[in-house]
Amino acid sequence: MKKLILVASMLIAVYSCKKADAKSENNTEVTASSEAPKTSNKIVTLSGGITEIVSALGHESEIVGTDVTSTYPESLKATAKDLGHVRSMTIEPIMAVNPTLILASDKDINPELLGKIQSSGIQTEIFNQEYSVEGTKKLIEQVAKAIGNTDYQKLNNKIDEDMKQVQPIAKKPKVLFIYARGNNLMVAGKNTPMEKLIGLAGGENAINDFEDFKPLTPEAVVKANPDVLFFFTSGLQGAGGNEGVLKMPGVSQTNAGKNKNIIAMDGGLVSSFGPRLGEAVAGLNKLLIESAK
């Protein structure tokens, strides 16, 4: 009888030890899992709109390099390296910041750089950016998925809400956008972001006989005869303000010159086609309505 009791006691002890060991192992696994370090990307963004999207989604701290058009948010100036313009950028500055992910638009980027990026071995996403409300919302979704974020709908909802502020304009004003930088003056033709923005805001692009940007000439200004001259804020300042613009050859002969209808907006806001698109359209729409009074 004593032997039976002894055997039973030993079996209970062995079972208890195994149970304790199993519990200990399980606890170790849970602890290891909960303490696993979170990984984050080192992102290079080569488009102002894409930079804004990544930042608005809460990943600004992961951006290590940007292109020259990425002026917003301003806090990036202190944390991300300016890599230059995608039209003239080389691969070396990009590689120097050791990115794990490169995000770029198919607009403007030079083919040689694009080829080198795609063969660099670094994860790369090149997006087809369409300059429209729906195209921008699609871009936001695509960028969000590329960085592993699913909380993008709030950004698209904000665009829709801002677009509700846009008021119809009975007679569409002809708007000429002038890009002014130093002595370089260019005007926006068809299929440019500025043409699309002007259309969304209720205006009509004053130039429709060529695409992209071309140098400003007095003949082109007079022929276009815009009702409104539109600048980036920095460009208007560089041109000498309204008085400087009115002295430009040909301007005084246009409706815009005669009525001194000159408007300006922040360049980063109106050209990026990112999360602030609705804000940009509503702002331009308001200026166009005011200029018609």
Language model: regions and residue ranges:
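Bacterial lipoprotein signal-peptidase II cleavage site
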Residues: 17-25
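Structured C-terminal subdomain patch of bacterial secreted/periplasmic proteins
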Residues: 41-42, 134-147, 154, 170, ...
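His/Asp/Glu-enriched short active-site or ligand-binding loop at hydrolase and phosphoryl-transfer sites
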Residues: 67, 190-213, 233
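Basic- and aromatic-lined ligand-binding clefts that recognize polyanionic substrates
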Residues: 36-57, 150-203
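A short, structured surface patch at a secondary-structure boundary
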Residues: 42-97, 101-107
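Proline-aspartate-enriched helix->loop->beta-strand connector
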Residues: 90-107, 122, 217-234
